[in-house]
Design a protein with these regions (language model features):
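Short, hydrophobic, well-ordered secondary-structure elements
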Residues: 76-98, 143, 150
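Extended intrinsically disordered or low-complexity regions, especially N/C-terminal cytosolic tails and loops
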Residues: 1-84, 133-140, 144, 160-213
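Short, mixed-charge amphipathic alpha-helical segments
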Residues: 120-162
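Short coil/turn linker and secondary-structure boundary residues
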Residues: 106-109, 113, 130-134, 184
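Short helix-capping and hinge/turn segments at secondary-structure transitions, especially at repeat
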Residues: 91-106, 127, 151-154, 201, ...
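Short acidic alpha-helical/loop segments enriched in Asp/Glu that coordinate divalent cations
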Residues: 95-118, 158-163
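Residue-identity detector for glycine
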Residues: 3, 88, 117, 152, ...
């Protein structure tokens, strides 16, 4: 919205987005540097000790590979933690939108319910529908993935099947059976974070425009 003053709500949405963007980039670089460092040391060790006893070389290489596995594991875990933080940001800002625009009644049980409540409020009050893109990606796929990470397992079989289907449809994760999911790389986190920002700003812009008319 051109010329719009930056409200406290918009400041929260944008500032927390910037913080999360920095964390996603910084943590990725940190662990990738560690992985690259180990790989360089392995290559150098193999070159220097090419003619040494095989058992001795293999023993030392196992130490390098163990260090590499630790880095990889931490990288995977950090993506999972950041993903859950991004979804928590999404839910928190939806709550802030509901409070800021006095949206009542509104089921605040989860992100999906909150967005549905905001859209219903908008339709009932302003007789106009909100057009929001990528809701299935965030409110279905990412919501189920967050629940899987938080609880370690989705107890409902239909939800497990749905998550598998969304993973194949949208990508960004690999899974083994339906009990273990892993975020492939940081590009998925960037996509989720940008999509969340788009949804939040779309809601905020539409509500602010109607309130100011």
């Amino acid at each position: 919205m051109i010329g719009r003053a930056r409200t406290n709500l918009r400041a929260e949405i944008e500032d927390q987005y910037e913080i999360l963007s920095f964390l996603v980039s910084d943590i990725s670089s940190h662990y990738q540097e560690q992985v690259d460092d180990v790989e360089e040391k392995v290559a150098e060790f193999k070159k220097v000790n090419a003619n040494e006893d095989y058992e001795i070389v293999s023993s030392e290489l196992r130490n390098f590979y163990a260090a590499s596995e630790i880095c990889d594991s931490r990288c995977v875990q950090s993506r999972q933690i950041l993903f859950c933080a991004i979804f928590a940001y999404y839910e928190t800002m939806l709550n802030r939108i509901i409070v800021s625009y006095n949206i009542r009644p509104c089921n605040q049980r989860d992100a999906k319910s909150m967005v549905e409540g905001i859209c219903k409020f908008f339709l009932d009050k302003y007789h106009s529908s909100l057009e929001i893109e990528n809701l299935v990606f965030i409110n279905e796929y990412c919501r189920l993935l967050r629940n899987h990470f938080m609880h370690g397992f989705l107890s409902d079989e239909s939800k497990r099947k749905a998550l598998c289907n969304y993973s194949e449809r949208f990508g960004g994760t690999t899974y083994y059976s339906d009990i273990y999911y892993e975020i492939v790389d940081n590009s998925f986190l960037v996509k989720v974070l940008k999509t969340v920002l788009e949804i939040l700003t779309t809601l905020d812009d539409a509500l602010c425009e109607q309130r100011n008319e």
